[in-house]
C-alpha cells in the first residue's frame, strides 16, 4: 500500500483479491499501515456522524426538545396553613352554582339540568301531560289518547306474575307418581 497506489482497485475474480490480501498481511509493516488506515477511517466516520447529528439538531431546533426543560433549582416548600394542603392548594371543595335563565334561581350545577327541564316544562312527564291535555280538548270522535278507550285494554304495566315453584321430587318417585 504505497502512497501513490490507488485506494480502490477492481479485481477480476475472488482468487486474485485473496492472493493480494495474503501478500499484504504477510508483511508486518503493511499490516500495521492497514490497521492504522482502518482505525483512522472508523474514527473519521464516527466524528463526522456526531458533527452531522449536532448540526441537524441545531438547525431544526430539536436540540431543546431532547434536552428538555431545566429543573427548578429552588427547593420545594411545604405550606403549613389551615385549609391548605402541603403544596399550598385549597383543600375545601366549593359547590358550583348556576343561575336558571328561566326563573333566575340559584341551583347547584349537579341539579341544573333536571331543574331547567321542569322549570321550562320540557320533561318526560310534561310532554305526556300535554299530549293528554290536547287529546281531552279535542272532540270525542277522535280516538287519539281517549280515556274511555283504555278501560277495556289489557293492563301491560301491571304486576309481574309469580312463577309456580315446582315441588321437589325425591329420587324414587316419578312425575306420574309411579316408582321404579
From Swiss-Prot:
- Where is composition skewed (Acidic residues) in this entry? 146-156
Q: Which GO terms describe its molecular function?
A: transcription coactivator activity; zinc ion binding
Q: Does the keyword Magnesium apply?
A: no
List the keywords (alphabetical).
Answer: Activator, Chromatin regulator, Metal-binding, Nucleus, Transcription, Transcription regulation, Zinc, Zinc-finger
GO biological process, alphabetically ordered: chromatin organization; regulation of transcription by RNA polymerase II
Q: Where is this region: Disordered?
A: 138-180
Assembly, in brief, is:
Component of some SAGA transcription coactivator-HAT complexes. Within the SAGA complex, participates in a subcomplex of SAGA called the DUB module (deubiquitination module).
| Name of the protein in its database record | SAGA-associated factor 11 homolog
**Species name for this entry?**
Aedes aegypti (Yellowfever mosquito)
Amino acid at each position: 500500500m504505497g502512497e501513490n497506489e490507488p485506494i480502490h482497485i477492481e479485481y477480476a475474480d475472488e482468487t486474485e483479491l485473496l492472493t493480494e490480501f495474503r501478500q499484504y498481511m504477510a508483511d508486518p509493516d503493511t499490516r500495521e499501515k492497514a490497521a492504522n488506515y482502518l482505525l483512522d477511517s472508523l474514527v473519521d466516520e464516527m466524528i463526522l456522524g456526531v458533527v452531522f447529528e449536532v448540526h441537524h439538531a441545531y438547525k431544526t431546533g430539536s436540540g431543546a426538545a431532547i434536552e428538555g426543560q431545566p429543573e427548578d433549582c429552588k427547593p420545594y416548600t411545604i405550606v403549613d396553613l389551615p385549609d391548605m394542603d402541603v403544596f399550598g392548594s385549597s383543600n375545601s371543595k366549593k359547590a358550583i352554582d348556576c343561575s336558571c335563565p328561566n326563573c333566575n334561581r340559584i341551583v347547584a350545577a349537579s341539579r341544573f339540568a333536571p331543574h331547567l327541564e321542569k322549570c321550562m316544562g320540557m320533561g318526560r312527564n310534561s310532554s305526556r301531560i300535554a299530549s293528554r291535555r290536547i287529546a281531552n280538548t279535542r272532540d270525542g270522535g277522535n280516538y287519539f289518547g281517549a280515556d274511555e278507550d283504555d278501560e277495556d285494554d289489557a293492563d301491560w304495566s301491571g304486576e309481574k306474575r309469580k312463577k309456580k315453584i315446582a315441588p321437589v321430587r325425591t329420587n324414587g318417585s316419578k312425575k306420574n307418581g309411579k316408582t321404579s
